Amino acid sequence: SHTNLTTLSEEEIEEDVIKSSNDIKAKKKKKAEFFSYPYGEYNQKVIETIKSLDFRAIFNQNLGAVAKESDIYDLNRIAVSKAAELQTKLAYEYLAAKWPTRDEMVTNNRLRRLRVKTSPEIEEAQLYLSGHGWRRVELEGGVLDLKVDLRLKYSRNRIFLKTYDNELSGKLIMKR
């Protein structure tokens, strides 16, 4: 199904995903080995529940590249709506970045603090938040430490850090 899993209990998530997996197995005569979050929407509860269901990999809908050090349970999957977009999106390189949790970044549906760790060589980059656009940011020792007060404008908000070498890392922040 395409249920918004973030609105379900752990038991309901498991039930929904197992039912969908069984439907796929019945129709295709093959076990579903990979999972993609419906509409790209997920939170920590969804991640932990899906990880327990024995999938080989889990895909999100965050724009970005994948590398050998990518988390197999949080792989970027590019949504492409026009052929012209494909070349642009495939040009992104993987940016290894350690993001804070949603609760460390957001209070009352406002982005308050962002502390992202990446390569010490990166001194400046661009930061994007849905509905607020791109802005130039400086990093110290590969760390972006930014205090902001930006409202999450949508139910699903994307946040990206992009270097001037076209390396990209991003996260999805759900509005509560």
Which residue stretches match the model-derived regions?
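Generic serine detector
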Residues: 1, 9, 20-21, 36, ...
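Terminal accessory/targeting
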Residues: 80-176
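Metal-dependent polysaccharide deacetylase catalytic core of the NodB/CE4 family, i.e.
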Residues: 1-46, 56, 69-76
